[in-house]
Amino acid sequence: MLSFATAQAQTVTSPNGKVAVILELVEGGQPCYRVLYEGQDVVERSALGLKTNIGDFTQGLVLKEITQKAVSDTYQLRNIKQSCVDYEATEAVATYALRDKPEMPVMDIIFRVSDRDVAFRYKILLQKETRVCVVTEEASGFALPEGTTSFLCPQSKPMGGFARTSPSYETPYTCDEPVGKNGWGEGYTFPCLFKMAQDQWVLISETGTDGGYVGCRLLNEQGGTYRIGFPQAGELNGAGATSAAVALPCETPWRTITVGPLANIVETTVAFDLTS
């Protein structure tokens, strides 16, 4: 296991060397990442972090350490595209503290980089006597290169459709459209597919969500930059919350990014790799 807390940018590479993630802490103490496939940016520098009621973990951070190790798993599932899966990846855990309290770690960002997928999630650490917190916003972003087009399912507004259950049903997909829109004003439902130059593709989704966290969507900020969005306030007739109340320590669901040629998109098993 390697530990290199002093570096400002670190690279995490897949076992076959084709996929790489570059982790950075930029001006203002903001954690960011990039994703490369065969040396080309498929996700440009994008934000990371969480906002909670016990602290803003999107800025003002210092890096305490990063560790890397190889991980592997073999599992079988019925009725999916591949009956026996051999999963291999490089795992990196970056630990951060607030700049004004550098002695106390507050959050880990955990990355898994396999031969066709990148996945990341957050772990909010215990804060002295604090045992619970509310996650109010996730800063996780996905900045896609210029010229990218999209294949997306717009999320409908709440309290419409059959028995007023929207957005529980799929809406018509838009195909090969330029990026820069926000669907019908409420973003997009996962999974979200994007096409780039040189026949490269990116599929963004989530996995590992359970009843202890909110299901999320993808919002467009501007141009080719998207970010994770929490539920709309009117969903389920207003019952439930648009934020996540969690017991500490807490790990969030995985954000997944499948990259490369279209075959990688079709063959990915990342939704099961991380939850088997």
Protein language model features and the residues they cover:
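Bacterial Sec-dependent N-terminal signal peptides
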Residues: 1-10
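N-terminal accessory beta-strand-rich subdomains and adjacent acidic, glycine-rich linkers
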Residues: 11-275
